[in-house]
């Protein structure tokens, strides 16, 4: 995939991410719990009822997680990495970054977004109600199934998108 196509796909993915977060924050109902964890050189875990967040990072890295409405968010960063895990209204998201930037967000019941990268400068994994999405390095690739999902890894050029019925995948 040439650089122009990769950039265009990255910009499109970024636009979709912003739109998804705008819709999710604008249309949500009151949540059972809102939790925020952040870490630089530490490990922070908060559990309240059915909601939980965790952020862990070495001194050169930063991790944040945000949870609303019985979600779970986990972020783990090492080697100068940045990661964010956002679980909203029943979603479960986990991001593990080594030296790059990784964002994982899951919105709605039954949604799961998992990401782990060692070499990517930027990767994103999003999942909507009933969706299952994962991103990793080249050996893992991008996985989209179930409900609405979006995955992209800029280092490998791998990505996928699912509307819950059909799935599109980049090599």
PLM feature spans:
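Low-complexity repeat regions of mature extracellularly deployed or surface/particle-associated proteins
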Residues: 33-171
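Terminal non-domain segments
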Residues: 1-50, 167-171
